[in-house]
Amino acid sequence: MRNPLADKVVDIKPSGIRKFFDIVSEMQDAISLGVGEPDFDTPWHIRDEGIYSLEKGRTFYTSNAGLKDLRQEICNTIQRKQGVTYDWQHEVLVTVGGSEAIDIGLRAMCNPGDEVLIPQPSYVSYEPCAVLAGATPVIIDLKAENEFRLTAEELEAAITDKTKVLILPFPNNPTGAIMEKSDLEAIAKVIEEHDIFVMSDEIYSELTYKEKHVSIVSLPGMKERTIYINGFSKAYAMTGWRLGYCCGPAAIIQQMTKIHQFAIMCAPTTSQYAAVEALKNGDPDIEEMRTA
């Protein structure tokens, strides 16, 4: 019988962290430190909005890109917090968690043989997603003496003529490292010089403590070459709602939406209604959980 399996899938090792999580989830009174998950419940006003949407029978598909109200609130939030303007109609896509955005972003941008730069330690899904997209992951080992920040020199040394995308995972899981504005400015200069693209995973953007998070998309020339990824799991304790989003150049978002519409159709409708409430009225919840 022919082997029914694809080599590139078989060669990927299952996540060790998820294995530990599955084991702990079946144990009583165990505190799991295995995955990045807040130990708070989703705030009640957000849950109530999801419940209300069900009671009103809002259980149908949304548009592929997501609810209009949600995409508009995403744009309002980014403008308010990062000073960056996006077009809700053409530059925003609501996804099933930030993880889907990583997956379809790499698939939309990478051709076979393209290299994806991945600073590590970092989220376990980056490397497998690059492989599944047909790209070649190139690891940049971050150093403790640099507080696990990515330096311009490390980035420069890793770039080749095959480099297509840099994944920028800051604030970082698992190290907790953050990038200061001066760090990002140096990184941005290298990115522009080599004409590469950035996938900026900022899912932990609300969990900084000493200083306000700065996004690379807020720097001159970076919005045009960056896919900005964020979501609701960490900031609003909504991991199980499975909702994220990405913003970027319309041409890239259009191709990501194409993959999304064939593979997913749309993100969960109930979660989208709850997320509108989170963005509109959830800032006090973020602060309460962040400082608890």
What is each residue range found by the language model?
Residues 5-97, 104, 278-281, 287:
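N-terminal small-domain helix-loop-helix segment of the aminotransferase-like
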Residues 27, 133, 193-194:
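Helix C-cap/helix->beta junction micro-motif
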Residues 33, 166, 201, 226-229, ...:
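Structural scaffold positions in well-ordered secondary structure
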Residues 86-92, 112-115, 162, 223-226:
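Short acidic capping loops at alpha-helix termini that bridge into adjacent secondary structure
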Residues 108-130:
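Conserved PLP-anchoring active-site segment centered on the Schiff-base-forming lysine
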Residues 131-138:
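A short helix-loop-beta submotif of the ANL/AMP-binding
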Residues 138, 142-210:
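Active-site phosphate-binding strand-loop segment of PLP-dependent enzymes
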Residues 223-291:
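Conserved core segment of the aminotransferase class I/II
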